[in-house]
């Protein structure tokens, strides 16, 4: 019998004559966690679709061996029956069904006569959740009553209920808090100890390094290297992913910081569902020309609510004023904000940043479509010229501007959203989690773009949950905790520990004034 549970040998997958996968080899042992690394669009998802029979046997070339035996699955149900289970980035739970019903979906336990055996399903669900160190979960409640971290564990329980021997985790931590991520990584370690193998796909290379035994890197559809994690570090992984050495993940573009041009005064946001509760409590700050201002804080601190209110996109009631060039401006709707010179790239790219049914180019010019209007028609030639320039400037990878934007990788979709906002020629640009779900190469390009914009005099407000990112690109850092401003720091030798201490402190604590800007 083979030492390997899974062997994928020489996998080739072609779309319209173009090889999306070109001879990929992947091997996984029982109890081993393999990190599958590569930039967006390099073929990671395509490879996993081949493995799980989303692309059935016969639609690709190469060989898959499962426990040493050729696997020629024609459907997902066949691969799941073999013990191969994928947990996708977009969770597949049904919100209104109970935890137990979600765990057993498609594999329900029944009584004679066909009725559901709910007591047995609840008991088994409780056993599974105890194995995942969640003994107090009420599995009879709707899964919607639990947060993202718990829902991720329900997905894992669902996979284990299918007798998973190989668990494929695709960006499993994208919506989790730091503490929830640590729980997830501990559970993966426990599963490994029980002999369950894992393929871990994530742009968060610190997680990959923490939990994976082996790293397999693919680039442009080709297998670059498979290396023991003990012989690797994060810079080496990045070099293999992008094909060049990156001496500094956070490139710095020299830029002069000028006078104050933007002020947020006494911004208060009230909870949408509980109008008596403040999500943002009387926050004021100023922003200078060419300055990059990072906003840090724990999840739920009120960062997104604050910047949404500044842009006129907060769905609840809010108060306060926005000033530009020493004058109050009306930013009560996104359209008014854009006209005033204030633009925002939202946190939820898929729901708020793009229109899925439109092409790449149409999404890029959407905010300035009136610029190309001639009476009752659009000047298509002028519009296409702008689209081509933005695609070139953003290094946006697309075969055609007429392709659906959903055909692009996450990083290229984000570049398209950025291009759309930059066509409005903003003076103040708000970026809410600009690199979430974006690979390391695209992150680098976004950081370079931010520096170049600041050098041109554009002022930038960036919200990020990654403290290393905040400290890596910001000139100044605001720290928000429980809806209140907890610190305003010049980013000179500022540490993650200092930012976290401010986020967790009482607003009147004396340490909050350390490094505080004038």
Curated annotation (Swiss-Prot):
Residues 6-245, 262-507 form the ABC transporter domain. It comes from Pseudomonas savastanoi pv. phaseolicola (strain 1448A / Race 6) (Pseudomonas syringae pv. phaseolicola (strain 1448A / Race 6)). This is Xylose import ATP-binding protein XylG. The lineage of its organism: Bacteria, Pseudomonadati, Pseudomonadota, Gammaproteobacteria, Pseudomonadales. It is found in: Cell inner membrane. Belongs to the ABC transporter superfamily. Xylose importer (TC 3.A.1.2.4) family. It is a peripheral membrane protein. ATP binds at residues 38-45. It catalyses: D-xylose(out) + ATP + H2O = D-xylose(in) + ADP + phosphate + H(+).
């Amino acid at each position: 019998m083979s030492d390997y549970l899974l062997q994928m040998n020489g996998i080739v997958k072609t779309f319209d004559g173009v090889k999306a996968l070109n001879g990929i080899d992947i091997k996984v042992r029982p109890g081993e966690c393999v990190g599958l690394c590569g930039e967006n669009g390099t073929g990671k998802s395509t490879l996993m679709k081949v493995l799980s029979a989303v692309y059935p046997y016969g639609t690709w070339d190469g060989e898959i061996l499962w426990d040493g035996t050729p696997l020629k699955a024609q459907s997902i149900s066949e691969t799941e029956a073999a013990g191969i289970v994928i947990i996708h980035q977009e969770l597949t739970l049904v919100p209104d069904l109970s935890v137990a019903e979600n765990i057993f979906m498609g594999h329900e336990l029944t009584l004679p006569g066909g009725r559901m055996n709910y007591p047995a399903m609840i008991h088994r669900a409780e056993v599974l959740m105890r194995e995942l160190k969640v003994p107090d979960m009420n599995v009879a409640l709707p899964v919607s009553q639990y947060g993202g971290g718990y829902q991720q564990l329900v997905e894992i329980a669902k996979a284990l209920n299918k007798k998973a021997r190989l668990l494929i985790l695709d960006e499993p931590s994208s919506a989790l808090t730091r503490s929830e991520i640590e729980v997830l990584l501990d559970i993966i370690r426990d599963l490994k100890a029980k002999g369950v193998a894992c393929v871990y796909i994530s742009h968060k290379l610190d997680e990959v390094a923490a939990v994976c035994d082996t790293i397999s890197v693919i680039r442009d559809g080709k297998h670059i290297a498979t290396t023991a994690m003990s012989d690797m570090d994060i810079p080496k992984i990045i070099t293999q992913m992008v094909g060049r050495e990156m001496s500094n993940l956070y490139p710095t573009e020299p830029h002069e910081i000028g006078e104050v041009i933007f002020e947020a005064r006494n911004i208060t946001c009230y909870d949408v569902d509980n109008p008596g509760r403040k999500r943002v409590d009387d926050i004021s700050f100023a922003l200078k020309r060419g300055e990059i201002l990072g906003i840090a804080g724990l999840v739920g601190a009120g960062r997104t609510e604050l910047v949404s209110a500044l842009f006129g996109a907060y769905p609840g009631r809010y108060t306060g004023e926005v000033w530009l060039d020493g004058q109050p401006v009306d930013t009560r709707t996104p359209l008014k904000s854009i006209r005033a010179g204030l633009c925002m790239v939202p946190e939820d790219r898929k729901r708020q940043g793009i229109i899925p049914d439109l092409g790449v180019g149409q999404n890029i010019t959407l905010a300035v479509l009136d610029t190309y209007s001639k009476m009752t028609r659009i000047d298509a030639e002028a519009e296409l010229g702008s689209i081509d320039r933005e695609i070139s400037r953003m290094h946006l990878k697309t075969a055609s501007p007429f392709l659906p934007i959903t055909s692009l990788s996450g990083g290229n979709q984000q570049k398209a959203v950025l291009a759309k906002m930059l066509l409005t020629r903003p003076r103040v640009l708000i970026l809410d989690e600009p690199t979430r779900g974006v690979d390391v190469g695209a992150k680098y390009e976004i950081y370079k773009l931010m520096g170049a914009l600041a050098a041109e005099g554009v002022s930038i407000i960036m919200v990020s949950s990654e403290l290393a990112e905040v400290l890596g690109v910001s000139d100044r850092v605001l720290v928000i905790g429980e809806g209140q401003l907890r610190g305003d720091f010049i980013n000179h030798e500022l540490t993650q520990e200092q930012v976290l201490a401010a986020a967790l402190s009482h607003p009147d604590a004396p340490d909050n004034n350390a490094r505080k800007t004038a």
